[in-house]
Amino acid sequence: MATGDLKRSLRNLEQVLRLLNYPEEVDCVGLIKGDPAASLPIISYSFTSYSPYVTELIMESNVELIAKNDLRFIDAVYKLLRDQFNYKPILTKKQFIQCGFAEWKIQIVCDILNCVMKKHKELSSLQKIPSQQRKKISSGKSEPPLGNEKISAEAVGVDISGRFMTSGKKKAVVIRHLYNEDNVDISEDTLSPITDVNEAVDVSDLNATEIKMPEVKVPEIKAEQQDVNVNPEITALQTMLAECQENLKKLTSIEKRLDCLEQKMKGKVMVDENTWTNLLSRVTLLETEMLLSKKNDEFIEFNEVSEDYASCSDMDLLNPHRKSEVERPASIPLSSGYSTASSDSTPRASTVNYCGLNEISEETTIQKMERMKKMFEETAELLKCPNHYL
């Protein structure tokens, strides 16, 4: 950016600030750098302290420029420029808040100051029109005296509020004060005292005549009514915003809880209590069926083995001589008494042992069957009561 353009824009800004009667010092270094802190005080002074007409306009438009941070202040200024001054700045809000764009920022500040001064002139000219009408009304109401009769009357003066001020003089003197409604300094030239002695005014006639003041307070009353109508809407919106913020906080807390639960419940399965009890009961039934089937298979196998063993033992008992004849040539010759005793003793012992095993196995199977019956009865009782926890 050329330094000549910056210097030219700074000179233009100085001229506008002189017209604006800006009382504070200007941070030229900050303006050259494009620091928004150097230009924001000038803008706030132009809107809030320069002209009472402009401040009234801002109050009527329900835009607040006081007690705000830089971002909200820029938002309000841009809205005010768009709605009331029909001006759109070249830079955006973010660009204006950032450092840089020095020449454009100085140009925007100059444009804002020119818009404010122009609006001030327009509003002041509109306020002068009712004051001129008031002058015409007051001049038209002054009537000439009816005759040359000497009337002893007190000196009468009309003050700003329309009341009569009397003094102890004999001759009537009417003093008319021209004033400005917005507390503007009144010059001595505007005061036109009428001291014509020949024009005598009767006090009773002045009391009878009604001085019609223009209705200046009507827009103020309307503005107050609008504020009264708008205030409940604003309060309702504020309450709704507060409720929305609370609900958002609740939603965030609920989301956090859900995330924690998801992390905790990873790899876990949630099952209803009734379904879980049904599953457990079915599992127990299946286990009992498996045990019973195993026991039955073992019992069947045991019976088959015992039958095979019994058949073999019977065959040995029936043919002991054949076995001895077959075994004798291969074996060493022994005494006849010892060999017969040994051959006869083994099958008998085996038959005795086999009978004892059968009795033990029958007793164990009966006991196992009784235990299985008890298990079935217990499972049936458990299935009857569904609220029981296994």
Swiss-Prot record:
Subcellular location: Cytoplasm, Cytoskeleton, Microtubule organizing center, Centrosome; Cytoplasm, Cytoskeleton, Microtubule organizing center, Centrosome, Centriole; Cytoplasm, Cytoskeleton, Spindle pole; Midbody
Keywords (A to Z) from UniProt: Coiled coil, Cytoplasm, Cytoskeleton, Phosphoprotein
Main localisation: cytoplasm
Ranges for region Binds with microtubules and centrioles: 11-195
Pfam families: CEP44
InterPro entries: CEP44, CEP44_CC
GO cellular component labels: centriole; centrosome; ciliary basal body; cytosol; midbody; spindle pole
Coiled coil: 233-269, 361-385
Region (Disordered): 322-348
The organism's place on the tree of life at top rank: Eukaryota
Positions where Phosphothreonine occurs in the chain: T346
Gene Ontology biological process terms in this record: centriole replication; centriole-centriole cohesion; centrosome cycle
Residue numbers bearing the Phosphoserine modification: S331, S345
Ranges of Low complexity composition bias in the record: 335-345
A GO molecular-function descriptor: microtubule binding
Subunit structure: Interacts with CROCC. Interacts with POC1B; the interaction is direct and recruits POC1B to centriolar microtubules. Binds to centriolar microtubules.
Main function: Centriole-enriched microtubule-binding protein involved in centriole biogenesis. In collaboration with CEP295 and POC1B, is required for the centriole-to-centrosome conversion by ensuring the formation of bona fide centriole wall. Functions as a linker component that maintains centrosome cohesion. Associates with CROCC and regulates its stability and localization to the centrosome.
PANTHER family in the record: CENTROSOMAL PROTEIN OF 44 KDA
Name recorded for this polypeptide: Centrosomal protein of 44 kDa
Lineage: Eukaryota, Metazoa, Chordata, Craniata, Vertebrata
